[in-house]
Every structure is written in C-alpha cells, then in structure tokens.
C-alpha cells in the first residue's frame, strides 16, 4: 500500500467531540491521499475524492497532500482533470498554484452554470454537487 497509516493521521486531524469524548478525525489530506489509490475494477473511490474536494477545497493543505503523494502526484492531477470536467465552475475555486504545480491548465469558468449538474448526472443520478431537491 502506498498510503500508510502513520502518526499524522491521528495527530493533525480536526478535533471532534462524540458523546462527550474529544477525538481526532482523519485529516482531509490523508483521506484524499488514501482514496486516490483505490482504482479497482469493482471499486473506485475517486467519487469520494471529488466530493471531498468539492466540499472542502479552500481548507485542504494542498502542499501537504502533494508532499504525501510525492512521485504519485499524477494521480491527483488525473483526479483534478476529471473534477474540472465534472464541475468546471467549482474547480476554479482551487488555488491556481495547485494547478500550476501539477502542470495543469487553470479551469475556465463555465458560461453555463447547469453544465456541472448535467455532467455529473451522466455518471450518476445522485446529487453529487448540489443539495437534494
């Protein structure tokens, strides 16, 4: 396995309280890092990666994620390419430096706001990038 569980998984995550107990949740960067490697015929976790990026792109420590990926950064580049196709309006919210570091073009804003919805619906009719109606 490329994404090994280590101290950073438990030391750096946000603190949450469950039933009065303070616990640390897994940091989003570690979760994305591990899910990028799940590309099997019967299971692919990239949809989870897209949803995490969509919900938390502003709070992701992209430098840390890229450091964890190291030579496997092309996996993130591939996921971001697909994400920018699925949600071109939202992909532009990811800081430009991330795109530059991965040598990807910065996504152009879509002239059609319904484009993200239509493209996501091609892959799955569940409401990926929108609230349920």
Feature-to-residue mapping (PLM):
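The feature captures the alpha-helical scaffold/lid subdomain characteristic of nucleotidyltransferase
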Residues: 15-24, 28-133
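Conserved catalytic core of two-metal-ion nucleotidyltransferases
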Residues: 1-7
